[in-house]
Amino acid sequence: MIIPIRCFSCGKVIGDKWDTYLTLLQEDNTEGEALDKLGLQRYCCRRMILTHVDLIEKLLCYNPLSKQKNL
């Protein structure tokens, strides 16, 4: 879905780092290097970025209103 704004454990703001993280990965950086360049040193914040699954594009393909038109 949408990247959380803050780390669930420590509360550090991480939501603004997602786009930069994706850009760094496209520049052939490893995940660890990208997280280091972003300044994410705590393992809880690193976990938030590493385990995030961006599903918003897939969910936009499903429109619940299109099924209701047939009623």
UniProtKB/Swiss-Prot annotation:
Gene3D superfamilies assigned to the protein according to its UniProt record, in alphabetical order: Homeodomain-like
Binding partners and assembly: Component of the RNA polymerase I (Pol I), RNA polymerase II (Pol II) and RNA polymerase III (Pol III) complexes consisting of 14, 12 and 17 subunits, respectively.
Record family assignment: Belongs to the archaeal Rpo10/eukaryotic RPB10 RNA polymerase subunit family.
A single BP term in Gene Ontology: transcription initiation at RNA polymerase II promoter
InterPro entries assigned: RNA_pol_su_RPB10 (IPR023580), RNA_pol_suN_Zn-BS (IPR020789), RPABC5/Rpb10 (IPR000268)
Compartments (UniProt record): Nucleus
GO MF annotations in UniProt: DNA binding; DNA-directed RNA polymerase activity; zinc ion binding
UniProt protein name: DNA-directed RNA polymerases I, II, and III subunit RPABC5
Keyword annotations from UniProtKB, A to Z: DNA-directed RNA polymerase, Metal-binding, Nucleus, Transcription, Zinc
Gene: rpb10
SUPFAM superfamilies: RNA polymerase subunit RPB10
Domain of life according to the entry: Eukaryota
Keyword Transcription: yes
Keyword DNA repair annotated: no
Binding positions (Zn(2+)): C7, C10, C44, C45
